[in-house]
From Swiss-Prot:
Gene name in the database record: argG
Protein residues bound to L-citrulline: Y89, N125, R129, S177, S186, E262, Y274
Signal peptide per UniProt: none
UniProt keyword annotation of Acetylation present: no
An example Gene Ontology biological process: urea cycle
Subcellular location(s) of the protein: Cytoplasm
Descriptive protein name: Argininosuccinate synthase
Subunit structure: Homotetramer.
Known pathway: Amino-acid biosynthesis; L-arginine biosynthesis; L-arginine from L-ornithine and carbamoyl phosphate: step 2/3
Top EC class, one word: ligase
Organism from which the protein derives: Prochlorococcus marinus (strain MIT 9515)
Residues the record lists as binding ATP: A10, Y11, S12, G13, G14, V15, D16, T17, S18, A38, G119
EC number: 6.3.4.5
Family: Belongs to the argininosuccinate synthase family. Type 1 subfamily.
């Protein structure tokens, strides 16, 4: 098969994507390999990673500062959607993939490349997310996936790279597979593959252990406007600053760890450890504010939408038509999600201790109270109950006659 002479490769600096560079040139006959390094707030030395790509044989290396887009266009919509895959995982890794894919396609267009490539294996979720996003945004582009096609073990891949001047990792190989960005960390493999093995503290980096977290609780107040978090306490902050601050506060107090059995897109179950302190806290606060500002029927239906939205994003359909339609529903619900939520952080817990909405609260104290200020008309309850239970009463009468 004849491949384009120029390809844009999603590059992380790891063994697989480094080996992809000479592999694409020598096994696929590609002349120019341009690497794209995404800065998602992972804390790495991005310039060094970019230089490593050049040292590994890349024709050119491009750095994309995607942190603000990551927060505003991906994390914040997930907060409004209360997105938790499997009712636990806030999609911290999954949200990054369509953003990287989008920028891969943009760079390929800009440089007139006929193909894009990534280093995902055939066993994980990311291959699905990348391929579906690229097909949606650049259906004419070829997608090349060397790590899915070569039959090399990790050790063999390292030896292959050494032939082309790519040094082997100098440190002892970590037993874990780790992915990090601003929103969180995912950790798998090693002894964690035994679902009964408790993770030790070396697995975690964004959150304190219960023993090491402060002995005294920390209360914080989060303000939302149209479903978006806009302030912590009395301080209005940019979206990026909000994520950074709640990451610190929640993580310091031991909140934000997830240990779960996850159903992967490819059909297998895997044991995953996640840290996502800020994202989890903001989703928790946002959902609480919705409880006071949205009607019961809207809340019930939104619960269904949220589950499907999270599934679609996890499964790679960020740019799909159903996800777009669900976005429209979520947008329509958020115009009244304005107010404040108070949370107490302590020893791994995030406890809601208050919520308010000055202009959009559906909570009426004069209707809910049992004091003398109660204005609820109790006499209306009898007629309501009669109508509400009519169908059950008819059914019971009919069955009583049949049984006799």
């Amino acid at each position: 098969m004849q491949h384009p002479k120029k390809v844009v490769l999603a590059y992380s600096g790891g063994v697989d994507t480094s080996v992809c560079i000479p592999y694409l040139k020598n096994e696929y006959g590609i002349s120019e390999v341009i690497t794209f390094v995404a800065d998602l707030g992972q804390g790495d030395d991005i310039e060094s990673i970019s230089q490593k790509a050049l040292n590994s044989g890349a024709t050119k290396s491009v750095i994309g500062n995607l942190v603000e887009d990551f927060v505003e266009k991906y994390a914040f919509p997930a907060i409004r959607a209360n997105a938790l895959y499997g009712e636990k995982y806030p999609l911290s890794t999954a949200l990054a993939r369509p953003l990287i894919a989008e920028n891969l396609v943009k760079l390929a267009r800009k440089l007139n490349a006929g193909a894009v490539a990534h280093g995902c294996t055939g066993k994980g979720n990311d291959q699905v997310r990348f391929d579906l996003a690229i097909n949606a945004l650049g259906p004419d582009l070829e997608i090349i996936t060397p790590a899915r096609e070569w039959k090399m073990s990790r050790e063999e891949a390292i030896l292959y790279g050494e032939k082309f001047g790519i040094p082997a990792p100098v440190s002892k190989k970590s037993p874990y597979s780790i992915d990090v960005n601003l929103l969180g960390r995912s950790v798998e493999a090693g002894f964690l593959e035994d679902p009964m093995q408790e993770p030790n503290e070396e697995v975690f980096a964004m959150t304190s252990s219960i023993d090491d977290s402060p002995n005294y609780p920390k209360d914080i107040e989060i303000t939302f406007k149209n479903g978006f978090p806009i302030a912590i306490g009395n301080e209005s902050l940019s979206p990026l600053k909000i994520i950074q601050k709640v990451n610190y506060l929640a993580g310091k107090n031991g909140f934000g760890r997830i240990d779960m059995i996850e159903d992967r897109v490819v059909g297998i179950k895997s044991r995953e450890i996640y840290e996502a302190p800020g994202l989890l806290l903001l989703i928790k606060a946002h959902k609480e504010l919705e409880s006071i500002t949205l009607n019961p029927d809207v809340l019930d239906f939104k619960n269904l939408v949220e589950k499907k939205w999270a599934q679609l994003v996890y499964q790679g359909f960020w740019f799909g038509p159903l996800k777009k339609a669900l976005d429209g529903f979520i947008d329509a619900t958020q115009t009244s999600v304005n107010g404040k939520v108070k949370i107490r952080l302590h020893k791994g817990n995030a406890i809601i201790i208050g919520r308010s909405s000055e202009n959009n609260s559906l909570y009426r104290e004069d209707l809910a109270t049992y004091s003398k200020d109660d204005i609820f008309d109790h006499k209306q309850a009898e007629g309501f109950i009669y109508m509400w239970g009519m169908s059950n009463k008819i059914w019971a009468e009919l069955n009583s006659k049949m049984n006799n």
